Swiss-Prot record:
One of its GO terms (biological process) is translation. This is Large ribosomal subunit protein bL34. PROSITE patterns: RIBOSOMAL_L34. GO terms for molecular function: structural constituent of ribosome. The lineage of its organism: Bacteria, Pseudomonadati, Pseudomonadota, Betaproteobacteria, Rhodocyclales. Transmembrane segments: none annotated. PANTHER family: LARGE RIBOSOMAL SUBUNIT PROTEIN BL34M (PTHR14503:SF4), MITOCHONDRIAL RIBOSOMAL PROTEIN 34 FAMILY MEMBER (PTHR14503).
Length: 44
């Protein structure tokens, strides 16, 4: 059986990257929440 996680930098950036997060209202909310919490890594 093939495992579900097949890492790819391109796919990772395109689905979870900072720019993608900033595109939608919900994504911006995620970034805002992570900033408020004090996360060092805001996206990916």
């Amino acid at each position: 059986m093939k495992r579900t996680y097949q890492p790819s930098v391109v796919r990772r950036k395109r689905t979870h990257g900072f720019l993608v997060r900033m595109k939608t209202r919900g994504g911006r909310a995620v970034i805002r929440a992570r900033r408020a919490k004090g996360r060092h890594r805001l996206a990916v």
